[in-house]
C-alpha cells in the first residue's frame, strides 16, 4: 500500500532541514476507504511550525493532487492547524495529536482509485526539525486514527 522513499534534503538549519522532498510516497489501487492518516515524528510537546504538502495524481477523482497542511505543535501537547489548503484531487482534511503525542495529518478524497502522491515537508527556520512519516493508514476514520 505505501512505500518509504529516501528524502531529498534542502538547506540544513541546526538540527533539521528547511525542506525535505519525498519524505513519503503513498499509493493505492483501491477506491475506498476514503481517508488516509499520516503520523509524523514531531512531538506535540515541542513547539514547531511546519507545512506538509501532497503532490500527485488521483485517477479515480480525475484530477491532479495538490494539497497542504500547515501545522503548529504548541509545546504543551497540542497540534493546531495553521492553514489547510486543497487545490485539487485530495482534501487536506485536518491535523491532530496522536494518542502517544505526535502530530498527525488527515487526507480525504471522494475516490482514491489508482491514486498516488509524495509528501514534502517545509519547516520554519526558527523551529527546525528533521520531519519524517512514521506511520500511514488508509481507512474510514474521519476523526483521529492514531
Please place each PLM-identified region on the residue numbering.
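Trimeric viral appendage architectures of receptor-binding fibers, tailspike depolymerases
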Residues: 1-146
Amino acid at each position: 500500500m505505501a512505500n518509504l522513499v529516501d528524502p531529498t534534503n534542502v538547506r540544513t538549519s541546526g538540527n533539521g532541514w528547511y525542506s525535505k522532498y519525498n519524505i513519503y510516497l503513498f499509493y493505492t489501487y483501491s477506491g475506498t476507504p476514503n481517508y488516509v492518516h499520516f503520523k509524523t515524528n514531531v512531538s506535540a510537546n515541542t513547539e514547531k511550525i511546519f507545512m506538509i504538502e501532497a503532490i500527485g495524481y488521483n485517477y479515480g477523482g480525475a484530477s491532479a493532487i495538490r494539497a497542504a497542511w500547515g501545522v503548529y505543535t504548541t509545546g504543551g501537547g497540542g497540534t493546531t492547524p495553521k492553514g489547510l489548503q486543497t487545490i485539487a484531487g485530495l482534501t487536506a482534511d485536518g491535523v491532530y495529536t496522536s494518542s502517544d503525542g505526535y502530530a498527525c495529518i488527515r487526507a480525504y478524497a471522494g475516490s482514491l482509485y489508482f491514486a498516488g502522491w509524495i509528501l514534502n515537508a517545509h519547516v520554519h527556520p526558527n523551529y527546525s526539525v528533521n520531519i519524517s512519516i512514521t506511520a500511514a493508514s488508509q481507512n474510514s476514520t474521519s476523526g483521529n486514527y492514531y
